[in-house]
Amino acid sequence: MNVFLSKYINGVDKKSRVTVPANYRAVLGKELFNGVIAYPSIRNNCIEVCGIAHIEKLRKMIETLDPYSEERDAFETMIFGEAVQLAFDGEGRIILPQSLMKHADIEEQACFVGKGIIFEIWQPQNFEKYLSYAQNIAHEKRLTLRNVH
């Protein structure tokens, strides 16, 4: 399967290492880089994580914007300028940079949330609050989903 699914909570050690769930690593197994690319979410108080293929898609989307627009500059700065490549160690762990941990309020635990083509890393209590909000939105907007044939 080539999508990130499910939710996992893993501990973060004193060296800021956290284990990426095995099934997430399996999705990334086809990537050229043995690790992930992480950047601060521009939507939520979390870290967005993906492989190189998704970063390429983001690059192509951003390149459609006027090269001198504020929007393009902001997206390039927040996504590419703040992105870091995080290699897996022998145990499937990554080291979370302090800047990303601060952005997401992560300390001792990290909540991994599958979002299809990306996954997010949250502070667990913050994710639970967001989950309630997301459930309400999904319930209200459920009829907007369409079948794709």
Curated annotation (Swiss-Prot):
It comes from the Bacteria. InterPro entries: MraZ (IPR003444), MraZ_C (IPR035644), MraZ_dom (IPR020603), MraZ_N (IPR035642), MraZ_sf (IPR038619), SpoVT-AbrB_dom (IPR007159), SpoVT-AbrB_sf (IPR037914). Residues 7-54, 83-126 form the SpoVT-AbrB domain. It is found in: Cytoplasm, Nucleoid. Keywords: Cytoplasm, DNA-binding, Repeat, Transcription, Transcription regulation. Pfam families: MraZ. GO terms for biological process: negative regulation of DNA-templated transcription initiation. The keyword ATP-binding does not apply. GO terms for cellular component: cytoplasm; nucleoid. Its main location: cytoplasm. GO terms for molecular function: DNA-binding transcription factor activity; transcription cis-regulatory region binding. NCBIfam families: PRK00326.2-1. Belongs to the MraZ family. Forms oligomers. This is Transcriptional regulator MraZ. It comes from Rickettsia typhi (strain ATCC VR-144 / Wilmington). The gene is mraZ.
